[in-house]
Amino acid sequence: MRKLWSSTVPGKDRSADIIFHFHQELPKLLRGYHQCTKEEAAILGALIYRVKYAETKADISSCLKSLIPSDLAKIMSSHEWKKEIARAYNKDSGMSPDEAKIAFLKVIYRWPTYGSAFFEVHQVSDPSFPEHLIVAINKQGVNMIHAQSKVL
């Protein structure tokens, strides 16, 4: 099931955040559609880890692909990612998985691409645009995003 929204504020409707919004936004982050810093990625990775494993101390390195955006995976070694995610995870000790979902949404809510529907586009007609684009459609309109740099 998919929920469409145009004026959602994380935390305002906890049930919708926990049931719909988190699960709709997570794959968009992991596919690398949003412009995200490595610091934000580590924080979000820790929140995703908490959603999946709560307080269980499983091995972070074995599940990195499900914690960080695909386009950022190679900017640090697995060991460095594990260290940064563990650091962020330890800062939020005692947070429940549902609270982690809302905290995740509050981070990405600040981004101009929050709540977008994304489309990967291969274009050949306009040489002033890159060959590979991501088209993001949200309440602010239609955005053309460079697939590698994530610049709007």
Identify the meaning behind each predicted range:
Residues P27-K28, Y33-L152:
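N-terminal recruitment modules of adaptor/scaffold proteins
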Residues M1-P10, I18-H21, K28:
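Cationic-aromatic interfacial patches
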Residues I19-H23, A41-A42:
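Non-catalytic, well-ordered alpha-helical scaffold segments
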Residues P10-S15, Q35:
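Conserved, non-catalytic sequence blocks in retroelement Pol enzymes and Pol-derived host proteins
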Residues D17-I18, I134:
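Generic detector of ordered secondary-structure context
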